């Protein structure tokens, strides 16, 4: 696992005795199309391919959350968090309802691999998902402090909602 923190990616391994899911935190596994938010120490875990996870954190309130979406744009009849256009605004609203101040929110973005990129002419859903997430966060004026996106391999992600730390391991 590598840990990402701060404005620039920090790819150092966890310090001795430091474990990604440790520290007495509850642990939640997030499936595609889900959103998890917590106001107490919690490690949210997910596995991403072309899907994207947006992690939001309020460093003052120590509240945060994560979404995991599959496709960039929702269809008219379905307002599901499986779609980025639904999942990102829902995550922002949920984190604020849990006690975060919108003006204090910072983001990290992960995933968006081109796992089917070997097929010529295949649509690059991973890249579309990443671009949508970055655009929606920019429109919401939420700064993106870190990202680990693209490539051809999936990722396992662990995010601590209370301190904003994230660990990523390519699969």
Swiss-Prot record:
Residues 1-23 are annotated as: Disordered. Keywords: Chemotaxis, Hydrolase. It catalyses: L-glutaminyl-[protein] + H2O = L-glutamyl-[protein] + NH4(+). The keyword Ribosomal protein does not apply. It is an enzyme of class 3 (hydrolase). The keyword Hydrolase applies. Its EC number is 3.5.1.44. Pfam families: CheD. Belongs to the CheD family. Probably deamidates glutamine residues to glutamate on methyl-accepting chemotaxis receptors (MCPs), playing an important role in chemotaxis. This is Probable chemoreceptor glutamine deamidase CheD 1. It comes from Anaeromyxobacter dehalogenans (strain 2CP-C). The gene is cheD1.
């Amino acid at each position: 696992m590598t840990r990402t923190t701060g404005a620039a990616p920090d790819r150092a391994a966890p310090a001795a005795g430091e474990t990604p899911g440790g520290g007495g935190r509850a642990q939640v596994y997030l499936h595609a199309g889900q959103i998890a938010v917590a106001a107490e120490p919690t490690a949210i875990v997910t596995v991403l391919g072309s899907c994207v996870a947006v992690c939001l954190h309020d460093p003052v309130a120590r509240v945060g959350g994560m979404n995991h979406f599959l496709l960039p744009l929702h269809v008219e009849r379905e307002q599901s968090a499986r779609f980025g256009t639904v999942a990102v605004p829902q995550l922002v609203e949920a984190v604020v309802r849990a006690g975060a101040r919108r003006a204090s929110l910072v983001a990290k973005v992960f995933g968006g691999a081109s796992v089917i990129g070997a097929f010529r002419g295949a649509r690059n859903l991973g890249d579309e998902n990443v671009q949508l997430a970055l655009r929606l966060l920019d429109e919401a004026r939420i700064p993106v402090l870190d990202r680990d996106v693209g490539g051809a391999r999936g990722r396992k992600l662990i995010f601590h909602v209370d301190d904003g730390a994230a660990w990523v391991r390519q699969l």
